[in-house]
């Protein structure tokens, strides 16, 4: 008795040790910095809200984003992928539950003998059940792996949604900027045409020469050449915006509003450590890592014995004649069984599967670390862009004011005969370039704010992220309906 109890306890301890070893060592995530390097001093720690695009104060933009959220075809495919992942998770979850089957049959028997004719009705009903004892956690790990993939699929959908909404905002701003650049280009053509009239009038009275006339005609043609290019770019931007809304571009129109009428929302980055709970792509990477870790547990457990319990019972018509009674007898029956199987030789298939699962876990661990680094870089780049654009704001305003003043002065002096033609031509080129550059600066500023909102997660949060670390949040993530 003593030896038997000792062996039993040793066996249990050994099984527990093996069960612990199946988990393996969890990869360590990189430690984020204490603060973002490019974050402005004394900035608030308010993260973007889920309706961050309202901050631009554009009703048309709000309507376009709402349309994209409901009609974007990529998002529709992503929602279908979520449904598929949920279905696979339900299939995997079924492996940890018993399976029960029911069956039945009925036969009509008739015959003749020396005693006359006879007939009987034979019927039977059977209920069977089987259950694999998940002693090593293989089935549970398989179910967990599928559940984490379903969680990752949801986060993938949210990442795509954030990318789509940011793309709508960027394309909308691009359309507005191209319209303004077209207006500036047409204004430049008109200014070049007016200057050509001045040069022609001076040439007719002998105050100008043919070279100046030809030069200005070339400048006018060059200015007109810009317009078709900008019109094509505008049409492409509108088409790109229509695609994001899931609509054909032929009938899609943008009402538009001046860029200067748009509000620039105040967006601040919080702590880098909080960023990891606010980026759906990082959440996806960690969920994939957890799935790979669970798959590795299942692959290791497959090397150990499996125990399957079976039970079946039924009832057969007890009124049959003895001549037609089978060996199983009549009336209620009950069968109980257990099967123990240990893989012995499979050509190395199970060990190769374990090696594959281990390599997959290593890949997902590297992908998780890469997602964290990429998230931090995205925020730093967006903050850096805004910082440099803020520094250039004053110079842009000064450049615009001085170039317009220089062009108007040079044009008047030339018209009055006090200035030379080359000064006017150079001033005209400069003022157009500065006006066009100023519009592109406004566009860059708006798109940098969009990029920062996107880099900060766009108001997304991991489930229960405010109360627990991300790994725990993964455990608490909404599960598929079983």
Where are these regions (language model features)?
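Bacterial Sec-pathway N-terminal export signals of envelope proteins
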Residues: 21-88, 260-290, 343-344, 369-372, ...
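Sec-dependent signal peptide recognition
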Residues: 4-13
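Periplasmic alpha-helical coiled-coil/stalk elements that build and connect Gram-negative outer-membrane
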Residues: 139, 155-271, 385, 389, ...
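Acidic, low-complexity, intrinsically disordered peripheral segments
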Residues: 9, 21, 263, 416, ...
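Small/polar, glycine/serine/threonine/aspartate-rich low-complexity segments that form flexible
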Residues: 47-56, 105-128, 142, 251-268, ...
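Sec/SRP-type N-terminal targeting helices
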Residues: 76-77, 93-94, 133-161, 211, ...
């Amino acid at each position: 008795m003593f030896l038997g109890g000792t062996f039993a306890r040793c066996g249990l301890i050994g099984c527990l040790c093996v069960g612990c070893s199946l988990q393996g060592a969890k990869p360590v995530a990189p430690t984020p910095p204490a603060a973002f390097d490019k974050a402005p001093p004394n900035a608030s720690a308010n993260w973007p809200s889920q309706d961050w695009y309202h901050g631009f104060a554009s009703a048309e933009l709000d309507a376009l984003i709402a349309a994209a959220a409901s009609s974007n075809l990529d998002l529709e495919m992503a929602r279908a992928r979520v449904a598929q992942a949920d279905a696979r998770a339900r299939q995997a979850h079924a492996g940890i539950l018993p399976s029960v089957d029911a069956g039945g049959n009925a036969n009509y028997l008739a015959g003749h003998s020396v005693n006359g004719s006879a007939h009987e009705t034979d019927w039977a009903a059977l209920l069977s059940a089987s259950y694999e004892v998940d002693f090593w956690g293989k089935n549970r790990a398989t179910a967990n792996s599928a559940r984490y993939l379903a969680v990752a699929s949801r986060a993938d959908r949210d990442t795509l949604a954030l990318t789509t909404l940011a793309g709508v905002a960027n394309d909308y701003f691009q359309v507005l900027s191209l319209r303004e650049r077209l207006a500036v280009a047409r204004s430049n053509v008109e200014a070049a045409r007016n200057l050509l009239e001045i040069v022609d009038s001076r040439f007719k009275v002998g105050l100008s020469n043919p070279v100046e006339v030809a030069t200005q005609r070339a400048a006018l043609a060059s200015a007109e050449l810009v317009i078709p290019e900008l019109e094509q770019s505008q049409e492409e931007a509108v088409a790109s915006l229509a695609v994001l809304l899931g609509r054909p571009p032929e009938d899609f129109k943008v009402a538009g509003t001046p860029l200067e009428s748009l509000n620039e929302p105040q967006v601040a980055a919080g702590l880098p450590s909080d960023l990891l709970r606010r980026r759906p792509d990082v959440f996806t990477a960690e969920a994939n890592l957890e799935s790979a870790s669970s798959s590795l547990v299942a692959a290791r457990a497959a090397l150990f014995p499996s125990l399957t319990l079976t039970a079946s019972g039924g009832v057969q018509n007890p009124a049959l004649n003895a001549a037609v009674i089978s060996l199983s007898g009549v009336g209620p029956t009950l069968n109980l069984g257990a099967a123990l199987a240990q893989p012995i030789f499979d050509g190395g298939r199970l060990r190769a599967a374990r090696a594959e699962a281990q390599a997959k876990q290593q890949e997902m661990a590297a992908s998780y670390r890469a997602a964290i680094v990429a998230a931090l870089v995205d925020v730093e780049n967006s903050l850096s862009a805004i910082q440099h654009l803020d520094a250039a704001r004053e110079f842009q305003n000064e450049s615009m004011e001085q170039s317009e003043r220089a062009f108007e002065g040079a044009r008047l002096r030339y018209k009055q005969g006090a200035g030379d033609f080359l000064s006017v031509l150079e001033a005209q080129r400069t003022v157009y370039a500065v006006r066009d550059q100023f519009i592109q600066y406004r566009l860059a500023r708006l798109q940098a704010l969009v990029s920062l909102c996107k880099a900060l997660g766009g108001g997304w949060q991991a489930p229960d992220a405010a109360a627990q670390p991300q790994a725990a949040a993964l455990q608490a993530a909404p599960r598929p309906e079983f």
